[in-house]
């Protein structure tokens, strides 16, 4: 009788331990999922606030000469960096703490020559988001695109580029803000979730660059 009871107790104990193990794995998985959702939500808030802060002072930002002007330090000193964004004093760029992605806010000048030999120069403000290949590339891209869409009335365009390890070169596309929106181009205000999914699928496991442009 004792052997039977002891044997049964052992089996029951192993069963309990197995249940605890399953519950522990489930709890860890649930916690990881909740943490990822939290980080993505915080990332979305930080990106949106950065865009709003930059657009609110864009007409006051200094830019002169032919070189690129960076505003990272200015935003840092003016206390205009949202929670979750830090200024890297060694490199000079901005870094978001959630997924360690790099950001530069700058005024860029690019000279061009058209087919007729006419020359000119485009002056454009850019918030440049760079994120290396990762498992969350799609979600990070989606946050940035949605933030750009919310500010479509005040931006020139959103440029997206992905660098594939399997395909040569880059894939680049432009989605335009309200200023340049027309029937012949893709417009931010018209993007739906399917459009964003198609666009950001290029960032799944690939290095991606998104540039939010203003004039």
Regions found by a protein language model. Name each.
Residues 87-215:
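Intrinsically disordered, low-complexity regions enriched in Pro/Ser/Thr/Gly and acidic residues
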Residues 43-64:
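Amphipathic, membrane-active segments
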Residues 37, 53-57, 147-154:
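Structured segments of extracytoplasmic/periplasmic soluble domains
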Residues 41, 49, 68, 162-163:
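Residue-level signal for alpha-helical context at structural boundaries
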Residues 1-36, 42-49:
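N-terminal single-pass transmembrane signal-anchor helix
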């Amino acid at each position: 009788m004792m052997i039977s009871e002891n044997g049964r107790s052992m089996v029951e104990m192993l069963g309990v331990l197995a249940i605890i193990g399953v519950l522990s794995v489930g709890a860890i998985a649930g916690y990881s999922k909740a943490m990822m959702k939290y980080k993505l939500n915080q990332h979305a808030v930080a990106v949106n606030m950065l865009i709003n802060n930059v657009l609110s002072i864009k007409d006051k930002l200094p830019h002169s000469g032919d070189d690129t002007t960076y505003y990272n330090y200015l935003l840092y000193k003016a206390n205009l960096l949202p929670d979750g964004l830090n200024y890297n004093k060694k490199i000079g760029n901005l870094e978001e703490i959630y997924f360690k992605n790099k950001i530069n806010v700058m005024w860029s000048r690019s000279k061009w020559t058209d087919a007729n030999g006419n020359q000119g120069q485009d002056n454009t403000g850019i918030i440049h988001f760079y994120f290396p290949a990762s498992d969350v590339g799609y979600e990070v891209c989606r946050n940035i695109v949605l933030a750009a869409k919310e500010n479509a009335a005040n931006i020139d365009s959103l440029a997206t580029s992905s660098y594939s390890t399997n395909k040569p070169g880059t894939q680049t596309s432009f989605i335009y803000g309200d200023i340049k929106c027309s029937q012949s181009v893709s417009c931010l205000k018209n993007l739906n979730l399917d459009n964003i999914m198609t666009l950001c699928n290029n960032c799944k496991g690939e290095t991606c660059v998104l540039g939010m442009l203003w004039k």
